[in-house]
Structures are given as structure tokens and as C-alpha cells.
């Protein structure tokens, strides 16, 4: 069954791998002229990171990762890492999240740049809504289906433009753009209440 979608490519490739590091169970993200690097805690033994490297450069991905490892003093063990060929990053959002007796949720309804890590949160929000109204949805109640589409699609549209804005800002993290980013991050660190509100908004999706 076909669903109408909006979609575009980000002009970046993503690479995923696991490396050994002492991460203290803290997720981190770094921004550079190459793109973004996310380090996500993987094991409970505090010895592994899951790496997501999103790059807009055509140069060797492992060489870029080694450069970032030195630039940010990450102390990652990259000796045996295998990044493979990567995959193209693409935005896809279903314009309507139901058709006939089929309801879309999670990655079936939208796919975002992993920069902000919000794809999972949005998918969980979809599932929570479906769980709350499962009986009416199973009956294909039109009002419930339309409310689901309106409520969740609004969240998806909001996140689309938030991520596009972040991508535009951090995708030009050099010169004046770099100074603005660093200034903004320092401002947030000085005012925890604003940072907490941003985190609260992200988690509500």
C-alpha cells in the first residue's frame, strides 16, 4: 500500500560501529566540519561505546574518526574498527499516518537525521497513543484515527523543523557559526533551567 511522503536526502552518510572506551555510562555528541559524532553507552561493564558517525565528507570515514578522536581527546580504541560502506541519510515523513485499516507508527511513519536522537522518542510517543486508544483504533473509528494522525503528525512536523534548524546551524560549525554555537552552549550551561526545559520538551514527544 502506498502512503504519500515528504522526503529529501541530507547529503551525508552514516556509519555505525562499536569501540572500546571508558564512557562512565554517559552519552555524548560532538560537532565538527565533517559532521556529527555520537557516542552512546553500549554495555554495563563501562567498556564499550556505540558510535554513530554522520559525515558530509567523501574522504575516508575511518580517517575522519581518527581525526575526531584526536581533536576531542576521546581516547577511543580504533585499532580494529570496521565502518563498512555506511548508508545515505534521508528524511522521510508520511503526510498521513493511516489508510484503510493500516496505522503507521515509529520509523514506518517518519525517519529523521539521528543528530538529535529524537526518532526513538517520537516512535515511543506513537506507540503510547496507540496503546491508549487501541480498542477504537481496532474498530477503525474515524475520529480516533484522525485525532491520532493530527496529534502525532504535528509532533513529527515540529521535530522536522527543529532538526532542520539544528542541521543548518551545526552543519556550518566553522568561523562565526562555531562562535555562535559555543556561545549558545555556554549560555545553556550557565542556566540549567532552560536546558532542563529543552530536555523536557524532547522527552514529551
Annotate each language-model stretch with its function.
Residues 1-84:
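Conserved FAD-binding catalytic core of PHBH/FMO-like flavoproteins
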Residues 73-74, 132-205:
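C-terminal helical "tail/cap" subdomain of flavin- and related membrane-associated enzymes
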Amino acid at each position: 500500500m502506498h502512503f504519500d511522503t515528504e522526503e529529501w536526502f541530507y547529503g551525508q552518510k552514516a556509519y555505525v560501529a562499536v569501540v572500546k572506551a571508558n564512557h562512565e555510562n554517559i552519552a555524548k555528541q560532538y560537532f565538527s566540519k565533517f559532521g556529527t559524532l555520537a557516542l552512546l553507552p553500549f554495555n554495563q561493564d563501562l567498556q564499550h561505546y556505540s558510535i554513530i558517525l554522520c559525515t558530509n565528507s567523501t574522504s575516508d570515514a575511518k580517517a575522519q574518526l581518527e581525526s575526531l578522536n584526536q581533536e576531542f581527546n576521546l581516547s577511543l580504541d580504533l585499532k580494529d574498527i570496521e565502518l563498512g560502506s555506511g548508508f545515505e541519510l534521508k528524511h522521510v515523513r508520511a503526510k498521513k499516518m493511516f489508510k484503510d485499516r493500516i496505522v503507521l507508527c515509529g520509523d514506518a511513519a517518519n525517519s529523521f537525521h539521528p543528530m538529535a536522537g529524537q526518532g526513538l522518542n517520537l516512535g515511543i510517543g506513537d506507540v503510547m497513543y496507540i496503546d491508549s486508544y487501541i480498542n477504537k483504533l481496532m474498530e477503525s473509528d474515524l475520529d480516533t484515527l484522525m485525532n491520532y494522525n493530527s496529534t502525532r503528525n504535528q509532533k513529527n512536523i515540529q521535530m522536522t523543523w527543529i532538526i532542520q534548524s539544528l542541521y543548518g546551524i551545526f552543519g556550518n560549525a566553522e568561523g562565526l557559526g562555531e562562535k555562535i554555537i559555543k556561545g549558545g552552549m555556554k549560555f545553556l550551561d550557565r542556566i540549567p533551567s532552560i536546558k532542563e526545559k529543552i530536555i523536557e520538551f524532547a522527552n514529551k514527544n
